[in-house]
Design a protein with these regions (language model features):
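Transmembrane beta-barrel domains of outer membrane proteins
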Residues: 20, 64-68, 109-111, 150-152
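Transmembrane beta-strands of outer-membrane beta-barrel pores
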Residues: 35-39, 65-67, 81-87, 126-130, ...
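Short loop/turn motifs that connect adjacent beta-strands in outer-membrane beta-barrel proteins
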Residues: 22-26, 67-78, 114-120
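Surface-exposed beta-loop-beta
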Residues: 1-19
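Outer-membrane beta-barrel "beta-signal"
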Residues: 79, 139-153
Length: 153
């Protein structure tokens, strides 16, 4: 069962790990892992219409390639994949026929160094089983296209 913040005065806790390793002059691999006490979420106290998601684990892994091989030393290509894994309490709290699944994501970006003050990064993200497909069984996968801009003064 989830903690009731009106009655329980227990602390929430979790931890995260992050590893980055340069394996070549231009290639860095990374891995991330996080865990939280899944009892910190209580669907009975969330605002109406909020789409909260009680997670227990999350992980991601990927690589980053600097632009040296194609003579753009300050550019960076990044690829990542990961999952968020809901708690068992969360899985049991919804219609069992929906069979809440793990949510996954894939991301790719390319950071273009324009000059010493400006970088532009087109970004693509693909999310499957959004919210574990627990809201309705026909939840579509999500495609996100973005453009990040970094301005340094």
């Amino acid at each position: 069962e989830w903690l009731d913040p009106e009655k329980e005065k227990k602390s929430a806790y979790g931890f995260g790990l992050s590893f980055d390793q340069k394996v070549h002059d231009a290639v860095t691999l990374f891995a991330r892992y996080g865990w939280q006490d899944p009892k910190v979420y209580n669907p009975d106290i969330t605002a109406s219409g909020d789409l909260n998601y009680s997670l227990k684990h999350s992980w991601s892994a990927g690589l980053q390639v600097e632009g040296k091989p194609w003579r753009r030393e300050n550019d960076v290509l990044g690829l990542a994949v990961g999952q968020v894994i809901p708690s068992q309490d969360y899985r049991r709290s919804f219609d069992p026929e929906l069979a809440c699944k793990d949510e996954g994501h894939l991301e790719a970006y390319y950071s273009m160094h324009i000059n010493d003050h400006l970088s532009i990064s087109p970004d693509f993200q693909y999310i499957w089983n959004p919210f574990g497909k627990d809201i309705s069984d026909d939840t579509d996968d999500i495609f996100i296209y973005g453009l990040r801009t970094q301005v340094d003064f």
